[in-house]
């Protein structure tokens, strides 16, 4: 492997992008449990030792991928919610929110792995930086949502998104089990466990928002 140290800012950014791209590709192909830092380094054509110049661990790499995915999600939500400004159209709002969320399986899978995997092998500094970014994105999505559904109110919308993120994050892995489990829950005897992710997320979001509006 021929490796040259990146010195200029654009070279450093390119090296980071190569590492992130390699990690994202491996994640989509194998899932996070099967991806090692060695595999990421090999895919990015960089030595494992030099990966540490850019990221402190495998988990730090995936935290950055998740941060970027959430930013894309929020930016797109701002765009698609803008036409609903002042409408108080709960059905249209939930449809837009859920459909945009469902379209981002990488983000959903990484969110599901956040507490049990991604936050386990990183420094406090990395966690703080990640959480600060997420707080900024939360403010943006709350603002866009309040513009679309002003009757819910700022506090009500905060409660809704707290519910939404936590419910979505827990629901995704429950509705995307391992293949052998999926075969079993598809049997009539176990239909109770066979839930559709989008429909369940949509239905529960409608219930919560209507409840907030009824207060």
Residue spans of the language-model regions?
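Alpha-helical structural segments
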Residues: 14, 18-25, 43, 60-83, ...
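N-terminal intrinsically disordered/low-complexity leader segments
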Residues: 1-14, 210
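A contiguous binding-surface segment within folded domains or other stable secondary-structure elements
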Residues: 112-148
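Helix-turn-helix
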Residues: 18, 26, 30-60, 64
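Amphipathic alpha-helical segments used for helix-helix packing
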Residues: 103-125, 179-184
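C-terminal peripheral helix-coil segments that are non-catalytic and often amphipathic
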Residues: 136-151, 167-215
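Hydrophobic alpha-helical connector segments
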Residues: 64, 78-107, 129, 157-164
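N-terminal hydrophobic signal/anchor transmembrane helix of membrane proteins
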Residues: 73, 88-109, 194-215
């Amino acid at each position: 492997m021929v490796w040259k140290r990146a010195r200029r800012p654009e070279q450093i950014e390119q090296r980071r992008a190569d590492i992130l791209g390699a990690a994202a590709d491996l994640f989509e192909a194998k899932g996070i449990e099967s991806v090692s830092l060695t595999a990421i380094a090999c895919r990015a054509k960089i030595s494992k030792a030099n990966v540490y110049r850019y990221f402190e661990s495998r988990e730090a790499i995936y935290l950055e991928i998740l941060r970027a995915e959430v930013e894309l999600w929020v930016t797109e939500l701002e765009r698609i919610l803008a036409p609903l400004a002042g409408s108080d159209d709960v059905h249209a709002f939930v449809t837009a929110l859920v459909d945009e969320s469902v379209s981002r399986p990488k983000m959903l899978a990484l969110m599901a792995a956040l507490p049990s995997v991604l936050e386990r092998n990183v420094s406090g500094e990395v966690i703080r930086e990640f959480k600060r970014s997420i707080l900024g994105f939360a403010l943006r999505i709350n603002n866009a949502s309040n513009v679309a559904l002003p009757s819910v109110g700022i506090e009500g919308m905060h409660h809704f998104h707290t519910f939404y993120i936590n419910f979505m994050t827990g629901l995704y892995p429950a509705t995307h089990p391992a293949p052998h489990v999926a075969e079993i829950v598809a049997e009539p005897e176990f239909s109770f466990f066979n839930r559709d992710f989008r429909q369940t997320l949509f239905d529960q979001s409608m219930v919560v928002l209507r409840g907030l509006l009824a207060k």
